[in-house]
């Protein structure tokens, strides 16, 4: 794998630069090369295995949502990353709190609508719908822009995630434990 220069990385911010960056990395199961891996199962399909037109079978090992659910809380727990985003704690009563970074639907979560943050959140979503400007959302919950948000119970504002991470295994065979 080659090392990227600072000039190359800075060039990505040019408006005529790339619209997406893709990193493909060869991963090996904990057991080593050729080891067996059991991916997650889903209620309606079991293993999420797709077959490409030429016959290659590809399985989802870790989904976009699952990856986001692990990345986002790091901004609350890693001392080096905490200063990068507002640390908003929502009071649940009886001395309990939850970080907005732990709310499953980010700024669009029901817990926000039942907190003192609800008016600010609504105003931020309405501003986005009216002007296309997401600055107010970024000030309240920048990870809502990074990992996506949908205010499904109120304004219906929906912002697509800008970071997608997924792990897939290629050329797989279906095995069972028995």
PLM feature spans:
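RAMP-family (Cas7-like) RNA-binding scaffold and associated basic/acidic loop-rich RNA-contact surfaces
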Residues: 86-178
């Amino acid at each position: 794998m080659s090392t990227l220069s600072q000039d190359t990385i800075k060039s990505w911010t040019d408006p005529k630069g790339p619209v997406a960056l893709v990193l493909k990395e060869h991963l090996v199961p904990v057991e080593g090369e050729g080891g067996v891996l059991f991916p997650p199962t889903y209620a309606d399909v079991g293993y999420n295995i797709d077959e490409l037109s030429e016959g290659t079978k590809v399985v989802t090992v870790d989904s976009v949502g699952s990856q986001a659910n692990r990345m986002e809380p790091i901004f609350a727990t890693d001392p080096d990353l905490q200063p990068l985003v507002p640390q908003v704690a929502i009071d649940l009563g009886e001395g309990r709190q939850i970080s907005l970074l732990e709310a499953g639907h980010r700024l669009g979560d029901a817990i926000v609508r039942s907190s003192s943050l609800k008016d600010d959140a609504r105003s931020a979503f309405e501003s986005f719908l009216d002007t296309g400007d997401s600055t107010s959302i970024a000030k309240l919950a920048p990870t809502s822009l990074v990992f996506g948000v949908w205010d499904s119970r109120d304004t219906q504002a929906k912002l697509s995630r800008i970071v997608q991470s997924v792990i897939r295994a290629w050329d797989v065979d279906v095995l069972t434990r028995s």
